[in-house]
């Protein structure tokens, strides 16, 4: 299978799972909150889910198996904290340290979670939160989250080879072209 076909298959799998979670819970609320730069929480978690599945497939070709369903749901719910952490609300202080526990609490309100899904959500901020993941799936999401956050923050500020100013310009992944234009002045 070509890389393009594999990526399309993963994208469809993530979209389907996200629609299911949106119907059963409040995942669509994450479209309203910005995570990194001008990327919404929804766009971020779907990117993390795609990266996690891609990495899991590479591991699978090396003979290392994962619980794909828990990996996907955990990736989509890892930032299910359901608030705008940019608001000056005192409860949002130390968001980086505390949001995994808020996300886990909200996810447990809306969904029945497996132990692996709980581990993914609670431990994805390692090493900032100093308790490491204890399963492969949580390690995968932890690493995919770091990679996607890097791309969303740093890479969005770097000049592109094609001369465009914004990594997310014209994106359909939940990032806002309008807010990109506001940032540029």
Region spans (language model):
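Metal-dependent phosphohydrolase cores
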Residues: 1-185
